[in-house]
């Protein structure tokens, strides 16, 4: 593609993001009219950011501190890249360049900032308990499980992406006695042919105190297939709610039915990638999505 072919797309992208910036500001003001005090303040934060800065996934100033953060990538004797997360090694796929590792880990640091709408542990009440059995569903690189590995009694990491299998094995090799990596999807039905399992079938004879899930919008299917587990075993849960516009409402409904109280993470995310790539139905008013729902009982 030559420079003349690039210009129209670039201008189109700028036009779309500017349109969305103004549209979200308008929606923030409209939503705030009937919002409670907390939500009104959160909406004002988004509006204030977008009045000064460009449209972005996390419309908050905290993201600026990660622009130039220094991230050291090292490699083990087999050439596998890793970063230190505290004193623990977090591994990435061997074929990844150091720069790709740095960019990926920067995204983790950004989304898990205490001010981020995607932050899992924004306060101590969200922490797993000592000796808890944790299900990390959609574990990816495993940072969540790694952060809580020492307090956990057992950790089950559900991750199907092949490129993460070896990095996960290396990351958790010091704790292999209490970590199980399960190469299955979690959904609302058991289906061996499609490699799906429900929480209810997997944990039928196992302890499960804590469930964290980030599974591309399938969190409601996980809840449907985990009714007995949630009703009788789980005490705390973190469920991502940003993939689909109505996920927050659906997740809250399941949690209430299962006897949980719930609260959202602070702030909102602006999930516009699909819209900017041509899927107009993927990003609609009121545009703002909660990142994570915390449930407890």
Set out the residue ranges of the language-model regions:
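Phosphate/nucleotide-binding beta-alpha loop and adjacent structural elements of enzyme active sites
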Residues: 1-297
């Amino acid at each position: 593609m030559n420079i003349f072919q690039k210009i129209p797309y670039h201008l189109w992208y700028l036009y779309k993001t500017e349109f969305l910036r103004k549209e979200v500001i308008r929606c923030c003001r409209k939503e705030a009219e009937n919002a409670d005090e907390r939500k009104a303040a959160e909406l004002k934060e988004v509006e204030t950011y977008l009045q000064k800065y460009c449209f972005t996934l996390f419309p908050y100033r905290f993201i600026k501190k990660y622009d130039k953060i220094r991230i050291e990538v090292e490699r083990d004797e087999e050439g596998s890249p890793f970063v230190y997360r505290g004193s623990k090694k977090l591994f990435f796929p061997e074929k990844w360049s150091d720069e790709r590792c740095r960019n990926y880990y920067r995204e983790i640091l950004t989304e898990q900032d205490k001010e981020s709408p995607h932050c899992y542990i924004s306060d101590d009440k969200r922490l797993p308990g000592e000796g808890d059995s944790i299900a990390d569903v959609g574990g990816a690189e495993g940072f969540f499980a790694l952060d809580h590995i020492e307090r956990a009694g057992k950790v089950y990491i559900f991750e199907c992406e092949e490129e993460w299998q070896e990095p996960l094995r290396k990351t958790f090799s010091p704790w292999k006695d209490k970590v199980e990596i399960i190469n299955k999807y979690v959904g609302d039905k058991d289906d061996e042919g499609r490699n799906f399992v429900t929480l209810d079938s997997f944990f039928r004879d196992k302890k499960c105190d804590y469930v964290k899930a980030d599974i591309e919008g399938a969190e409601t299917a996980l809840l449907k297939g985990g009714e007995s587990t949630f009703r009788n075993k789980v005490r705390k849960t973190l469920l991502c709610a940003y993939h689909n516009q109505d996920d927050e409402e659906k997740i809250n409904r399941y949690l209430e039915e299962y006897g949980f109280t719930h609260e959202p993470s602070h702030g909102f995310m602006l999930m516009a990638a699909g819209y900017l790539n041509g899927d107009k139905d993927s990003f609609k008013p009121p545009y703002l999505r909660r990142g994570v729902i915390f449930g407890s009982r």
